[in-house]
C-alpha cells in the first residue's frame, strides 16, 4: 500500500496536476475577487471565508479527473481490481495521494492568501482547522465522481457537474466555521458538522467509489 501511495504521488506530480496548479488557481481566485467586489477591506473581510473556501473547492476540482484516468488508460486499474488489495483500500490511497498533492498545499498556503482578503486575525486558526477537516472530504468525494466518469471520452467535462453538488455541505460548514471564528461566535455546531461530514465521507464513500469502478471495468 505504501508503494501504491508513492507511485500515485509521483504520477500526480509528473502529470502536472499537483502542487503548483492548484495553488496557482487558488491564488488567481483570491486576487480576482477584489477586482469584482472592490478593494474595500470591510467588504473583503466579510466575504473572505466564503471566497477562500470556494477557491479551495475549485482548486481541488482541477485534478479530480486524473485520480483514475491515468491508471485506466495504461491498464493499471484492471490489475488493481484483481490485486489482493481491496478496491476500497485502493480508492482510499488514491484519495490520500490527491489530498497530499492538492489539499495539503492549499491548507499551508491559505493563511498567506487570506491576507489579501483582509481576513480578521481571530479567523486564521479556524481557517486552518476548517481546511484540515474539510479538504480530505473533498478528495474522497472526488473519487466517487472520478469513478463514475472513468473511461468516458468527455468525463472531464461531466465530473465537475457530479462533484460540485456533493461538495456543497462541506463548503457551507467550512465557510461558516471560519466566519464564526472571525466574529467571535460559537463554533461548536459548524465544527461538529464539518467533522461529521468528513468522517462519514471517509467511512462510506470509498465503498461507493469502488462499486462504480467495478461496474465501469466490466
Curated annotation (Swiss-Prot):
Transmembrane segments: 18-38, 43-63, 99-119, 131-151, 155-175, 185-205
A biological process term (GO) from this entry: cytochrome complex assembly
Compartment annotation: Cell inner membrane
Keyword Signal included in the entry's annotation: no
Membrane topology annotation: Multi-pass membrane protein
Keywords linked to the UniProt accession: Cell inner membrane, Cell membrane, Cytochrome c-type biogenesis, Membrane, Transmembrane, Transmembrane helix, Transport
Superkingdom of the source species: Bacteria
A Pfam family this chain is assigned to: CcmB
One term under GO cellular component: plasma membrane
Primary localization: membrane
GO molecular function, one term: heme transmembrane transporter activity
Family membership noted in the UniProt record: Belongs to the CcmB/CycW/HelB family.
NCBIfam families found in the cross-reference section: ccmB (TIGR01190)
PANTHER family: CYTOCHROME C BIOGENESIS B-RELATED, HEME EXPORTER PROTEIN B
Protein role: Required for the export of heme to the periplasm for the biogenesis of c-type cytochromes.
Protein's UniProt name: Heme exporter protein B
Organism field: Rhodobacter capsulatus (strain ATCC BAA-309 / NBRC 16581 / SB1003)
Gene (name only): helB
